[in-house]
Amino acid sequence: MRKCLLYSVLTLVFTTCSVNKNNVAEAPATKVEVEQKLAFQNLFDASSKDSISCYRIPAIVTAPNGDVIVAIDERVPSCGDLKWSNDINIVIRRSTDNGITWSNIETVVDFPLGKSASDPSMIVDKITNNIFLFYNYMDLDNEKDVYYLHVVKSSDNGKTWSKPEDITSQIAKPEWKNDFKFITSGRGIQTTSGKLLHCMVNLNNGMHVFGSDDHGKTWYFLDTPIQPADESKIVELADGSLMVNARVNKKGLRYVHTSSSQGKTWETKADSTLIDPGCNASIIRYTSVKEGYKKNRLLFSNAKSEKDRVNMTIKISYDEGKTWSEGKTIYIGSSAYSSMTILKNGNIGLFFEKDNHTQNVFTSFSLEWLTDGKDKLETPKKQ
């Protein structure tokens, strides 16, 4: 057992606590005792397969029918990123019961040796019930420095997927052919108006928002580069404006970019309350007053540390990202990329890289647990 000191917000005194051998954070005592201990399910374990070097880059969404889909890189000859590995596949697992049980690993994208796919991300179209899975592609044998941007689509909640479509020419300029460019892993969004939006990074020219106004039939990008920004996530705010939460390396914090003009112009600020070691993170909308909930809520997950990829933490905002809670630690050890979704039972699902990428774990918890009993999800009454 390892001993630690936990500052009690309610009593303003030091309280001794214990953390179990798996470093799972436990809720402190509050006026409302919330009984839930987190269980970590390692969904992709490279140690069980001799041919796989590692699994990396998690993405998670909830399908239109409520099934949960997790996607990830299956890195075969080495654990190197796309440009340095000639055999990376995109694989998924699915759950029909809020993440209690899972399907076997299913391959979505697997090119011949020498061609690789990496960095999965997904968007769920709640109007058409289609799911779009994006990834970055390279033909390392013939065009070793050229990144292509692909998408596949599922119309049956992730059971089957279409053939890959190359959308590079739609969301990137021709002169960017040899630039280091990629679609950010994790997830994009569908706005209240129905458009699909996502983030694409060109390390030479800045981060660009791309999207579709016709449910994925065609794609476009906004030629208003955002800097500084590496891997980024986008959310729609309650007033219809857009917010991009961005990784920036060697700064020790996140940068936030907002637009009230649908991406024509952007305002940028560094958010000192969102400390970050330079790592991919996740931000999603949990509830919206417009949808009948009593509060607007945003959720943010990352490795909460200025230098090291450790301390996976979830924060909540009630004012559209202007301020954030101190956050609750999910895992204090080695933690890297993360992705979140809202399960059909209203709980929060988290899929993240754990213990130096040796595990890719899923866990879930209620809003009540996350806030130590201070907030509880109330489903809107049907009109």
Language-model segments: which ranges?
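Positively charged n-region of N-terminal signal peptides that target proteins for export
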Residues: M1-C4
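Sec-dependent N-terminal signal peptides
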Residues: L6-L10
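Short, conserved catalytic or interaction motifs in soluble domains
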Residues: V19
